[in-house]
């Protein structure tokens, strides 16, 4: 058998992989070189892999959860609120601030999409600290104990507030942080925690610096009145596309990427890294499909 594999011509094997493997494994695979004459296909994610979406009842979480489920992925929601859909779902109702709830939610999970957070500036001790700091700690510890290999965590463009507002544009993800608020500082903490998980524990971690995602009609009005916010608008459709690619494409280690839709005027957040790593190509621009976030 080993000799037969060695005799399999490389071009034929590559064509075989592209033709056959996607129909067997969803959604992608690595081609890893074993020696000069052989390649082996390694699936990025088997159909049995469960993806946990935290904050799945929120505006962003609902979009990501529903999109992945429509694509045929096995998805589990984790939120303090009950499942917003009437159909039976794999759902854990619990608190991010509870280590036990995080452990329960992560049982059997292979990939985590962490969207749960207090999403705006708020009292630090009562709101931001329990959810965005302590809750993140509990989640990452539970992920480590459960053997999770890939984690995608929401950050924010607010961590680079100074260049985002004053240039030079487009702002790349490697620039030094200049957080707007205590909320943005919690996301700086999350980015550094992600580096620790990748460096010390071998996890594949992606920090996603989200553009403007309106959670209500009032929030959408604020974005519509701000030319910079309009340029970093992140539509529901592009949000779904981004996370589907981040789940399915082969990447390893730590990455920090900007994520937004097409700008109306000026590219404020560089999308080059996301295009290069994931093949992400935004389709929408402000205000395309904005109502889908809350309808």
Model-based region annotation:
Residues 50, 286-295:
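Amphipathic terminal alpha-helices
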Residues 52-70:
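N-terminal Rossmann NAD(P)H-binding glycine-rich loop of SDR-like oxidoreductase domains
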Residues 89, 94-131:
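NAD(P)H-binding glycine-rich loop region in Rossmannoid oxidoreductase-like domains
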Residues 112, 123-151:
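NAD(P)-cofactor binding segment of oxidoreductase domains
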Residues 130, 166-201, 205:
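Catalytic helix-loop patch of NAD(P)-dependent Rossmann-fold dehydrogenases
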Residues 138-180:
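Conserved Rossmann-fold NAD(P)-dependent oxidoreductase catalytic core, especially the SDR/UDP-sugar
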Residues 212-217, 233-254:
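Alpha-helical substrate-binding/gating segment
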Residues 221, 255-257, 262-281:
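Conserved C-terminal active-site "lid" loop/helix of NAD(P)H-dependent oxidoreductases
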């Amino acid at each position: 058998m080993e000799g037969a594999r060695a005799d399999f011509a490389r071009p034929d094997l590559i064509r075989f992989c592209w033709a056959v493997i996607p129909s067997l494994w969803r959604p992608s695979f690595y081609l890893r070189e074993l020696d000069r004459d052989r390649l082996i296909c390694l699936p990025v994610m088997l159909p049995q892999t469960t993806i946990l979406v935290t904050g799945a009842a929120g505006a962003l979480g609902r979009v990501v959860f529903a999109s992945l489920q429509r694509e045929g992925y096995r998805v589990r929601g984790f939120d303090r609120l009950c499942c917003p859909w009437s159909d039976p779902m794999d759902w854990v109702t619990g608190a991010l601030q509870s280590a036990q709830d995080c452990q329960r939610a992560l049982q059997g999970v292979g990939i985590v999409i962490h969207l749960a957070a207090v999403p705006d500036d708020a009292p630090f001790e009562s709101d931001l600290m329990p959810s965005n700091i302590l809750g993140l700690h509990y989640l990452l510890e539970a992920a480590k104990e459960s053997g999770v290999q890939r984690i995608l965590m929401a950050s924010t463009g607010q961590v680079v507030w100074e260049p985002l507002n004053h240039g030079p544009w487009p702002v790349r993800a490697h620039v030094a942080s200049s957080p707007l608020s205590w909320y943005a500082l919690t996301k700086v903490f999350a980015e550094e925690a992600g580096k620790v998980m990748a460096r010390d524990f071998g996890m594949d971690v992606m920090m996603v610096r989200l553009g403007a995602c309106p959670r209500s009609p009032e929030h959408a009005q604020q974005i519509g009145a701000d030319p910079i916010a309009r340029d970093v608008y992140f539509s529901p459709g592009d949000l779904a596309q981004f996370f589907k690619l981040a789940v399915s494409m082969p990447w390893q280690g730590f990455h920090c990427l900007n994520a937004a839709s097409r700008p109306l005027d000026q590219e404020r957040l560089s999308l080059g890294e996301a295009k290069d790593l994931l093949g992400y190509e935004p389709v929408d621009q402000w205000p395309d499909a904005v109502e889908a976030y809350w309808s």
